[in-house]
């Protein structure tokens, strides 16, 4: 199927950026632009927003436009509870994963792209409503500050060629025994595995 005149064909050269933009656009649609959107319950495997998600983890995510200025994220003190902040660039690199409470500042230079996704994972016991409520309170204590709100402007990626490329990459993923070197910083990943991971590992 041919792309429309205004759509950009997607192939292995630009798939990582197109696929990452797709997920960021979904996060924006869900209300997570320039502020955190919190999932208060555990991911429904039929309706999860990413390919891989944990059943004992609550997710909070936000997309920011770093052209509008740096962002300060504050993680609360979670005590013994697992809480992490993953930073994801538009090129599906993860320049930082943070496990300690505190204030952290991010800008375009440190992230590497205009748009960034902040993904916070908070552990909760799926069989304990009291524990779930405590985890929800921690989610509410996650804060994000930016002097001004930016805009969300991404290319018009051609969905048909993007889907075709994704399907081919998922076929390549079937023979891989693990996800080693798919995710991490640019220096940590293997370029081919990183490309496959963009299709299989969101």
Show the residue positions of the predicted features.
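A compositional/structural signature for long, glycine/proline-rich flexible linkers
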Residues: 2-202
């Amino acid at each position: 199927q041919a792309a429309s005149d205004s759509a950009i064909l997607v192939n292995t050269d630009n798939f990582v950026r197109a696929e990452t933009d797709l997920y960021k656009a979904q996060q924006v649609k869900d209300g997570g632009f320039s502020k955190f959107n919190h999932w208060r319950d555990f991911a429904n495997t039929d309706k999860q927003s990413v390919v891989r998600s944990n059943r004992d983890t609550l997710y909070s995510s936000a997309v920011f436009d770093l052209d509008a200025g740096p962002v300060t994220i504050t993680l609360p003190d979670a005590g013994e509870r697992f809480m992490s902040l993953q930073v994801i660039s538009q090129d599906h690199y993860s320049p930082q994963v943070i496990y300690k409470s505190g204030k952290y500042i991010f800008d375009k230079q440190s992230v590497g792209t205009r748009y960034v996704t902040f993904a916070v994972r908070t552990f909760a016991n799926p069989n304990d409503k009291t524990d779930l409520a405590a985890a929800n309170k921690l989610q509410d204590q996650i804060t994000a500050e930016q002097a001004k709100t930016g805009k969300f402007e991404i290319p018009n990626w051609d969905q048909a060629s993007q889907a075709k490329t994704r399907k081919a990459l998922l076929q390549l993923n079937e023979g891989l025994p693990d996800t080693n070197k798919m995710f991490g910083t640019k220096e940590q990943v293997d370029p081919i595995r990183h490309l496959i991971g963009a299709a299989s590992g969101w």
